[in-house]
């Protein structure tokens, strides 16, 4: 009953468009940047030149999502720093 009262002024097409925007925004800002971080962390020292070029292109493309996670991720190499 409550859901019908809230969604009755909004058409089903508008809700589908809103859901598509939320899905694409979540992919662009959360899912792909996290996958890109993990892929670059594993492959950084063994990338070829074309793979590195594509990684730089993807960093440029997904920069807003990467900058959201930058304060929380530590990708330093093991063995760096004071003991």
UniProtKB/Swiss-Prot annotation:
Highest taxon above the source species: Bacteria
Coiled-coil intervals, chain numbering: none
Transmembrane region(s): 15-35, 53-73
Top EC class, one word: translocase
Pfam families xrefs: NdhL
GO CC terms: plasma membrane-derived thylakoid membrane
Keywords assigned: Membrane, NAD, NADP, Plastoquinone, Quinone, Thylakoid, Translocase, Transmembrane, Transmembrane helix, Transport
Membrane topology recorded in Swiss-Prot or TrEMBL: Multi-pass membrane protein
UniProt GO MF annotations: oxidoreductase activity, acting on NAD(P)H, quinone or similar compound as acceptor; quinone binding
Location of this chain's protein in the cell: Cellular thylakoid membrane
Substrates-to-products reaction catalysed: a plastoquinone + NADH + (n+1) H(+)(in) = a plastoquinol + NAD(+) + n H(+)(out); a plastoquinone + NADPH + (n+1) H(+)(in) = a plastoquinol + NADP(+) + n H(+)(out)
EC identifiers of the protein: 7.1.1.-
InterPro entries: NADH-quinone_OxRdatse_su_L
Job of this protein: NDH-1 shuttles electrons from an unknown electron donor, via FMN and iron-sulfur (Fe-S) centers, to quinones in the respiratory and/or the photosynthetic chain. The immediate electron acceptor for the enzyme in this species is believed to be plastoquinone. Couples the redox reaction to proton translocation, and thus conserves the redox energy in a proton gradient. Cyanobacterial NDH-1 also plays a role in inorganic carbon-concentration.
Quaternary assembly: NDH-1 can be composed of about 15 different subunits; different subcomplexes with different compositions have been identified which probably have different functions.
Family note: Belongs to the complex I NdhL subunit family.
HAMAP family associated with the record: NDH1_NDH1L (MF_01355)
Entries under PANTHER family matching the protein: NAD(P)H-QUINONE OXIDOREDUCTASE SUBUNIT L, CHLOROPLASTIC (PTHR36727:SF2)
Name listed for the protein in its UniProt record: NAD(P)H-quinone oxidoreductase subunit L
Originating gene: ndhL
């Amino acid at each position: 009953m409550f859901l019908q009262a809230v969604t009755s002024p909004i058409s089903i097409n508008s809700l589908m468009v809103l859901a598509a925007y939320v899905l694409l925004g979540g992919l662009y800002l959360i899912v792909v940047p996290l996958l890109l971080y993990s892929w670059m962390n594993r492959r950084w020292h063994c990338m070829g030149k074309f793979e590195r070029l594509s990684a730089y292109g993807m960093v440029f493309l997904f920069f807003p999502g990467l900058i959201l996670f930058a304060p929380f991720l530590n990708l330093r190499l093991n063995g760096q720093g004071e003991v």
